[in-house]
Amino acid sequence: TKKSAKTKTKKLTYTLKVAKVGVALSGDSVVAIGSTTKLTNTKKNSSRAKITYTSSDDSIATVAADGTVTGVKAGKATITAKITVGKDSATTTKDVEVKNYVLSTVAQNKLTELTATVTGNTKNLKPTDFVVKNETTNVVYPVSKVSVDSKDASKVTLTLFSELKDAATYDVTLDGITKTFVASDGKVASIGLDNVTIPAATETEVKLVSKDANGVIVKEVSYPSSDSTYDFTIDTKGNGYTS
């Protein structure tokens, strides 16, 4: 008789690793009234992950389903993000402060003029809302005028009473936020005309503009010049060209 074949059985073991659910928020922690900032989760999760956002105080800041936070009134609120994958979940929070204005950038355009990027209801800005101070001497330079761009309300121009041409570092503070810039040294590095193309039969003012090495306007002189420091002439002879 034939011997019966032996049956061999092998046991295979698979280990399935399940990544833990994670959530961490990135985004601005300061937002102006009426403006928005987007919070996003920086942790990688399953495509099945569902994230929800809530605000501790909707009267200060609201948050949409996609993490967009809108400033309502000045104050502080805590945004909570909860991510869920199946039965697993994770939660994190981010504190957000709502201000009347948020100062993002500041730069010098002329010796007595600064340009700033500001969010908020900028049409209500006043010269006294800004503090311009020399970091070394702590001397404050008052702002005489605030102008808001008619097409882009976030572009704000500050006119100062005094020229800043000492190459010093200055602080500009608005609603508790401070940005810095280095002032011009007041040395002329280039000279040119502000308008090099003029429409035919159209009266157009032409200015001689001198700038420092960083492009800050040191001086503007209108033609014809009455300034003893600069002398320039315009030759109107030729075939449509001037020199």
Q: Can you describe what each PLM-predicted range is?
A:
Residues 1-101, 121-124, 134-150, 164-167, ...:
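Extracytoplasmic soluble-region selector
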Residues 177-180:
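Short acidic/polar inter-strand loop motif in beta-rich domains
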Residues 101-115, 204:
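Beta-strand/beta-sandwich contexts
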Residues 67-69, 114-116, 154-161:
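A generic structural motif
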Residues 170-172:
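Short beta-strand segments enriched for Tyr within beta-sheet-rich domains
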